[in-house]
Amino acid sequence: MQDFEEALDRIVAGLEKKNRVMNPTERKFVAYHEAGHALVAEMRKNADRVTKVSIIPRGIAALGYTQQSPTEDRYLMRRSELLDRLDVLLAGRVAEQLVFEDVSTGAENDLQRATDLARHMVTHYGMSEALGLVTYDARPAPLFLNGPTLPEPRTFSERTAEAIDGEVRRLLDEARDRVTQTLRTNRGTLEALAALLLEKEVVDRTMLDGLMAATAAPAQLRVAAVALPPGDGGS
């Protein structure tokens, strides 16, 4: 069983980097970062189930990771699910800011993925009330048949481009605000999970269930992310 789990970890997060030794400050940042991801995932009813949290460096750049597994096959994603996914992606960065009043470069991939997701919600899926049921998709067009592609000229105005950027920012800002509220409300659980990670380095599902129960933040208290009206959240 241990060999199977190690093989799965290699597939999900890459090879363990035993020569990548973090200093104490880095370990604390990574522990709170991953604890933030895991805790917010536990508190969002549409988020995938957390199966493991680790602060063991793996792969090319990962200093830690939160492993999630869907409970069922999915062929489409609802808006509520995408909003919860935004929350989980931003939770590591928000945890750093909340605890240390500082942030690190560790959230780079999270921020890129969150930005891409928010932009797709606005430009591909018609999930912006401000812009309506319109897609703004500049798909690359082949230069020659089966040849390299070139971006198509933008088919919308500069004003629309600014509106798209504004909606993307709004979605991200609102997600940040929701996550900040969740982590502040459950600060004790965040601290306990980070401490457990610093002690054990890996927290599995059983350990997480025990911690959530002991800190009065059971998984059944999960709440869905609720979108704020346009213009009410963030800057």
Model-derived features: where do they sit?
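Soluble catalytic regions of large protease machineries
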Residues: 25-32, 38-235
